[in-house]
């Protein structure tokens, strides 16, 4: 049981900086200004469900995609590391706010015409929470843990769905409490936390690249 908690804790530490619910909160507040409370709650729940579904598909179908296209684990690690590091640099040195992204602008125009338009999948679930970096990390981690003997087989079966469920619950709670979070932390606090998470992502991305290169060297040495 202790191994299960360790696996869940490790998974949350890896995924939460990438998912970054606080950035999604700021985006949600910018897009849901004209929605009533019931509609906001519905969008929050749907976004969380979509995030859980995306992560589950990425984890269980990722290996099939790799096998189909002949992608090696070192190659995936290097590619995933580049994506994660790039996202980290963008969070560390932001050039635009989440609300100014093309997806958010498109939804803003749609909301002007139809205030009850669905913002749960795009942009809240994807790309804000379960974007390319999150998906690449999940696929790469799935390939790594299946070859690892660190955890028992039953832990590797139970932990991933629980991790994805907890990330979805954290996102749901953050969106439901978005107003309170913004009042408590403020825009400056969210930016500071996002930059800290960005630094962590750069470190994680670089380490992914190093691990991929080392595996290639071992293979051909």
Curated annotation (Swiss-Prot):
It is found in: Cell inner membrane. InterPro entries: Multi_antbiot-R_MarC. Residues 29-44, 90-118, 176-196 are cytoplasmic. One of its GO terms (cellular component) is plasma membrane. The keyword NADP does not apply. It is a multi-pass membrane protein. Keywords: Cell inner membrane, Cell membrane, Membrane, Transmembrane, Transmembrane helix. It comes from the Bacteria. Signal peptide: none annotated. The keyword Membrane applies. The chain crosses the membrane at residues 8-28, 45-65, 69-89, 119-139, 155-175, 197-217. Residues 1-7, 66-68, 140-154, 218-221 are periplasmic. Belongs to the UPF0056 (MarC) family. This is UPF0056 inner membrane protein MarC. The lineage of its organism: Bacteria, Pseudomonadati, Pseudomonadota, Gammaproteobacteria, Enterobacterales.
């Amino acid at each position: 049981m202790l191994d299960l908690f360790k696996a869940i804790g490790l998974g949350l530490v890896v995924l939460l900086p990438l998912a970054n619910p606080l950035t999604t909160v700021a985006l949600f507040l910018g897009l849901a200004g004209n929605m009533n409370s019931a509609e906001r709650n519905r969008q929050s729940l749907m976004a969380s469900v979509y995030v859980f579904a995306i992560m589950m598909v990425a984890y269980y179908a990722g290996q099939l995609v790799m096998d189909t296209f002949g992608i090696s684990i070192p190659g995936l690690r290097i590619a995933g590391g580049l994506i994660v590091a790039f996202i980290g640099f963008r969070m560390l040195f932001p050039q635009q706010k989440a609300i100014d992204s093309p997806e958010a602008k498109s939804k803003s125009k749609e909301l002007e015409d139809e205030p009850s338009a669905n913002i749960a999948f795009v942009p809240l679930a994807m790309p804000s929470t379960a974007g390319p970096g999150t998906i690449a990390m999940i696929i790469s981690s799935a390939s790594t843990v299946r070859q690892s003997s660190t955890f028992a087989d039953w832990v590797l079966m139970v932990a991933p769905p629980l991790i994805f469920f907890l990330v979805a619950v954290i996102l749901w709670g953050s969106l439901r409490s978005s107003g309170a979070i913004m009042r408590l932390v403020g825009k400056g606090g969210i930016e500071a936390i996002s930059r800290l998470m960005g630094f962590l992502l750069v470190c994680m991305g670089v380490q992914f690249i190093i691990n991929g290169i080392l595996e290639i060297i071992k293979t051909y040495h």
